[in-house]
Amino acid sequence: MKSVEDLEDKNVLVLGMAKSGISAALLLHRLRANVLVNDANANQPQELIEKLENKGIRMVLGEHPTNILSQNKIELIVKNPGIPYTNPVLVDAQARGIKIVSEPELAYWVMDSELIGVTGSNGKTTVTTLIQLMLDDNKKHAYVAGNIGVPATTVAQKATAEDKIVMELSSFMLAGIDRLHPHIAVLNNIFASHLDWHKTRENYVNDKMNITKNQTKDDFLVINWDNTEWQELAKRTQAKVVPFSRQGLTKSGAYEIEGKLYFKDELIMEADEIGIPGEQNVENALAAIAVAKIEKVSTAHIKQVLTTFGGVKHRIQYVENLNGRQFYNDSKATDIEATQVALRSFKKPVILIAGGLDRHDDLDRLIPDLEPNVKEVIVNGETAEKFKKIAQKAGISVIKDSSRVSESVEIAYQDSKEGDIILLSPAAASWDQYKTFEERGDEFIAAVQNLHKGE
């Protein structure tokens, strides 16, 4: 395990616990830093508290004290990606000139492996997973890490120089990088998202583009070519640009023409052989194909992965067929674009379960995708009233309220007919009612399973 920065005896604040905060704190302790963990939530699992206490790692829980930096002579902050830079502790740190980094940045400081970074507004987890499956073999290992739910600092310590790390990087994570340098960076797409955190679209785009800021001419940027703005963004990189296009706009990378997927002049497979539904997954497949071909993976193995891959949990995840009704869990659809993608994946009648945290998005953009197939909308959460209005505009006559996702499932099943799709795709974050989108999706799955038990 390398270390590009001497952290011995350095006073380091880990801001925010969660899985990544715990992992970062343990790594810093291993590097002989003086570690202090701070989280505004005092109700942390006892086993985590004991894990840190057993290492002699100090904790301040229940608040973010304004004097925590001066009182502890903090020299470096490793922050949870969800904590905004407007947090008073971070405002104070910036005024004092204290370096603030994200957990993936810390991981990069000790990483021996080649790094492949994946970002984008939608499809990151699917692309990350596909790349890992394509690169992993009996001789070398490929690990996933980052926003996919596996702390980067955990993986960085166990992966060897012969291995590869495929890291899903959110805009929140990329806002806090300094030296992080992927050999291959993937930009899947960029839509207006998380503007409550980034404040402006320009800030959001700039944070996304941090994925390529340290790349050189010896590296690669795999980028979606189906939008002129994204083509312009490619001009910012020093890396070799490898485009992918579902519209067949380029033949210099991965692309689709007439239902066939190619890399440069080589036919890879038929698009309808991909094991997961939806046009967005053709796009995700093309991004993964481009990376795999840069890494010299055989076409046979690429095809084997794409034909057998069953999808990622909470991302248009097929749950069950109950009396001819198909249930899909798309809890990860925390923005409008993701729900648009989900709705376009189905041609059968859809009962949509939607709603969540109100981030003041323009929900009217959903109307063209509601009109063709959505027969009923069941709403919950802060955006419930706004969803009712756009459903009415879309000409949907059946619009119902529910208190939680579990109740929505019961209503949807009662109202459904054989052949219907019952889809959870909230077009909103979960934080008004649930800690995470995973918790929301798990409630959906459990509710479907309860229906099955009652049959």
UniProtKB/Swiss-Prot annotation:
Nucleotide-binding as UniProt keyword: yes
Transmembrane region(s): none
Tree of life domain: Bacteria
Positions that bind ATP: G120, S121, N122, G123, K124, T125, T126
GO cellular component, one term: cytoplasm
Pathway entry: Cell wall biogenesis; peptidoglycan biosynthesis
Any one Gene Ontology molecular-function term assigned to this protein's record: UDP-N-acetylmuramoylalanine-D-glutamate ligase activity
GO BP terms: cell division; cell wall organization; peptidoglycan biosynthetic process; regulation of cell shape
The protein's enzyme class: ligase
Family the UniProt entry places it in: Belongs to the MurCDEF family.
HAMAP family xref list: MurD
Stated name of the protein: UDP-N-acetylmuramoylalanine--D-glutamate ligase
Gene name linked to the record: murD
